[in-house]
Amino acid sequence: MATRLLCWTALLLPIIAATAAASPLPEACPVPTAAEEILGPGGTCTTLDRRGDPVGVIEGDEVTLAKAITLLHMNKDDYIAVLFYASWCPFSQECKPNFEILASLFPSIRHFAFEESSIRPSIISRYGIHGFPTLFLLNSTMRVRYHGPRTVKSLAAFYRDVSGFDVSMTSEAVLHSVDGIELKKDAEQENCPFWWARSPEKILQQDTYLALATAFVILRLLYLLFPKIGSFAKRAWRRHTLFPNLVGVHEYFFTYLEQARHKFFRLYPSKRGNLQEGARNATAWASKSLASVSIGEPSTIGRTNSTNELR
C-alpha cells in the first residue's frame, strides 16, 4: 500500500508542477498613459490604484478635444485648461514649458495641449483663435480666455481667480522658485498669427475641401468677370493709343502749314515785301488818325461852348 502511494505521488508531482507553472500569475496593475488615464475606457484597475501617477499635459488631436469637452458636460472634472499652440511660433515655445509647470502646480485641473497642425482650422476658428499661443480655462458653464503675461506666477494667479483652486502644497516650492523670473515683455505679449503664417502646403493637406472650394469660387468669379475686364482693358488701350495719335496729327498739320508758308514766300518774295510794306503803312495811318482826333477834340468843345453862350 505504501509502495502504491509513493508511486502515485511520484507520478502526480510532475503533473502538479507543470500545471502550476502553466497557470498565469496575477499581473500588477498596468500604468496607463496620460490620455488613457483621463479619456480612455476604464480597465481592471481602479482609479485609486493609479492615484500616485502624475498626469501632466495631455497632447492630443480633435478626438481628444471632443472627449475633453465631453468630460465637462459629464461633470467628471470641474475645470480643464486647454492650450492651442504652434510649433513654428517662438511665443508658443516660450509658453509651453510654463504650461507644463502649471500642470504640476494644479493637479486637480486637467491640462490639454493641441498643436496647430493636429486641429482643423474650422475648429480653431470656432474657438475664436486668431493667434498662437492661446490658453483657455473651461468648465461646464463658461470658457475664460487668458490675456496677460505668460509667466508661471501670472498664469497661477489666473487659475486661482477663475477656478478658486490654490497651488498644491507639494508644488509651492516650484512656484517660489519661479517667482524670481522677470517679465521680459509687456502685459499684452505678442501672438503668432493663425491664418497668414500658415503655408499653402499645410492648408492644402489639412483642409483639402476648403482649398478646393476656395479655388472654385475664385475661378467662377474670374469666369464671370473676365468679359467685363477684357472690354475695359480694350477701351483703356484704345484711349492710350488714340491720344498720342491725335497729338501726332496736330503736330504734323502745323509742320506742314509752316513748310507751305515758307515755300509760298520763296516762290513770291515780292508779295512778301508788299505784305510787309502794307502792314507798316496801316500802322502809320492808324497812329496819324489817332493823333488828329486827340488834337481836334478841345477846339470842337470850345466852339460848342461859345455858341451856347451867345444864344
From Swiss-Prot:
The organism's place on the tree of life at top rank: Eukaryota
Membrane-spanning segments: 210-230
PROSITE patterns, per database record: THIOREDOXIN_2
Disulfide bonds: none
Sugar attachment sites: 139, 281, 305
Keywords: Glycoprotein, Isomerase, Membrane, Signal, Transmembrane, Transmembrane helix
A matching Pfam family: Thioredoxin
One cellular-component annotation, GO: membrane
Xref: InterPro entries: APRL4/6, Thioredoxin-like_sf, Thioredoxin_domain
Thioredoxin domain residues: 23-164
Keyword Membrane: yes
Membrane topology category: Single-pass membrane protein
Endpoints of the signal sequence: 1-22
GO MF entries: isomerase activity
Subcellular location: Membrane
Name of the protein in its database record: 5'-adenylylsulfate reductase-like 3
Organism for this UniProt entry: Oryza sativa subsp. japonica
